[in-house]
């Protein structure tokens, strides 16, 4: 660890990651009192908006967000393809990459259907890993995606996150970190 370049890819301290849960709870409890203020915001334009959940999440994890999106006058859609990265799909890096390709293909089909029905391009709201998918979907289907909004999406080198060592253990990768890194990017 004497290489000065390796220090730039150190994950944050575990304490900071543990404290994130408390911060998330605090932010959720402020949502209810803020409801009156949020209700006074200008209404949407009826555009279709799809939510994409974070790692391990499914449509239920974005249901409150979709409720607000619908309340603001947008046409809210779940991604409707199940859990984001179920453990069976993530046994190795090949499985992860295959799952990601399936997500782009399946959500792409949903985007086509929504565009055909509404005549409008779809805005994507991606939470965490869902934000990474949203960016890939916009690049793959620019004629179907109006805009991308990301919430807590991990941009940058994944080795600088608390999740990197967990993901490497989770997928039981035999590759050196640099090889996994190249496949992710």
Show where each model-derived region lies.
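Flexible, membrane-associating and regulatory peripheral segments of lipid-active enzymes
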Residues: 1-50, 56-68, 72, 78
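Serine-dependent carboxylesterase/thioesterase catalytic core
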Residues: 47-66, 70-185
